[in-house]
C-alpha cells in the first residue's frame, strides 16, 4: 500500500478506481463550499460502495460546542480535532440532496448525542480514559456489545452507506 497525500476535492485517481471508498470523520473538517465537490470526487473514484461517517447536523455541532466550553472552563487545551470542529457548521443529511439516481443511500445512526457528550467529558480525565482503554483491550466483545446499544437517534454521528445500483459505464 502506498500513501497518497491530496485534496479531497481533487482526487488523483481514475474513475471507478476502487471497489469501495471510506471517508471517516473528514466531512466536518471540509469547508462547506467544498463538501459537494468532495462527495462528487468520492463517487467518481468508487466503483461499488462509498461509506461516509461524520458528526451530523446542528445538534451534534452544539454538543461539541458545549464540550469545547467545558475544556475552556477547566483551563484545559481542547483537542485539535475539537478545535477544528468549531471552524465550520457540521454537514447534515442534505449533503446528499443531489445524489445521482445511480446511487442508493442507507443511513446508520452512530452514537447518541447524549452518550457522545458524556464519553468525551469522561475522556478529559486521564484515569477514566486509561480505564476505558484497558477495558477495551481486556473485554472487547463486552464493550462492543455495550457500544452498539448507543447507536440510535438522536445520533451525534451518522454513517452513510452509498451503493451503486448498477455496474458503472466506463468512459
Please give the residue ranges for each predicted region.
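Hydrophobic beta-strand segment of the Class I
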Residues: 21-22
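Short gly/ser/thr-rich secondary-structure transition/capping motifs
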Residues: 2-3, 30-32
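Short, well-ordered alpha-helix to beta-strand connector turns
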Residues: 1, 18, 46-47
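S-adenosyl-L-methionine-dependent methyltransferase catalytic module, highlighting the catalytic core
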Residues: 32-171
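Conserved SAM-binding strand-loop segment of SAM-dependent methyltransferases
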Residues: 1-12
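Histidine-centered divalent metal-coordination motifs
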Residues: 25, 29
Amino acid at each position: 500500500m502506498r500513501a497518497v497525500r491530496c485534496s479531497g476535492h481533487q482526487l488523483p485517481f481514475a474513475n471507478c478506481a476502487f471497489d469501495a471508498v471510506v471517508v471517516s470523520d473528514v466531512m466536518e473538517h471540509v469547508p462547506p463550499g467544498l463538501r459537494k465537490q468532495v462527495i462528487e470526487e468520492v463517487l467518481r473514484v468508487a466503483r461499488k460502495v462509498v461509506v461516509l461517517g461524520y458528526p451530523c447536523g446542528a445538534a451534534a455541532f452544539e454538543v461539541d460546542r458545549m464540550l469545547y466550553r467545558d475544556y475552556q472552563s477547566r483551563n484545559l487545551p481542547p483537542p485539535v480535532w475539537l478545535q477544528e470542529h468549531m471552524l465550520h457548521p457540521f454537514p447534515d443529511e442534505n449533503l446528499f440532496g443531489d445524489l445521482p439516481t445511480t446511487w442508493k443511500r442507507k443511513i446508520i445512526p452512530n452514537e447518541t448525542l447524549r452518550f457522545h457528550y458524556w464519553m468525551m467529558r469522561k475522556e478529559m480525565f486521564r484515569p477514566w480514559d486509561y480505564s476505558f482503554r484497558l477495558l477495551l483491550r481486556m473485554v472487547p466483545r463486552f464493550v462492543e456489545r455495550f457500544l452498539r446499544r448507543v447507536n440510535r437517534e438522536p445520533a451525534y454521528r451518522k454513517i452513510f452507506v452509498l451503493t451503486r445500483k448498477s455496474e458503472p459505464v466506463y468512459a
